[in-house]
From Swiss-Prot:
GO BP field: ribosomal small subunit assembly; translation
Organism domain of life: Bacteria
Gene coding for it: rpsS
Record-given protein name: Small ribosomal subunit protein uS19
This protein's record includes keyword Chloroplast: no
Length: 92
């Protein structure tokens, strides 16, 4: 379900403060965030965020194509190791 237009995009307040501070300082450090539910705004383009996936912070470099998506979309939480193979087909 899509969010109402009249509400606007959701962004954590602390995330805006961290992004503004990073822009003002001019440093290109990874900004650690835990808010996977926040929407990526145009003012975040060019910054690198460390999005927490439950184990570690995954570095995500923001570009123009990511605007409007959520941070959590770019930091997978589950690891797929593949299905086990059939023993008959491996025998050859």
């Amino acid at each position: 379900m899509v969010r109402s237009v009249w509400k606007g995009p959701f962004v954590e307040g602390s995330l805006l403060k961290k992004a503004d501070a990073a822009r003002a300082s001019g440093r290109h450090d990874v900004i650690k965030i835990w808010s996977r539910r926040s929407t990526i705004l145009p003012q975040f383009v060019g910054l690198t965020f460390g999005v927490y996936n439950g184990q570690k912070h995954v570095p995500v470099a923001i570009n123009e194509e990511m605007v409007g998506h959520k941070f959590g979309e770019f930091s997978p939480t589950r690891t797929f190791h593949g299905h086990s193979g059939d023993k008959k087909s491996k025998k050859g």
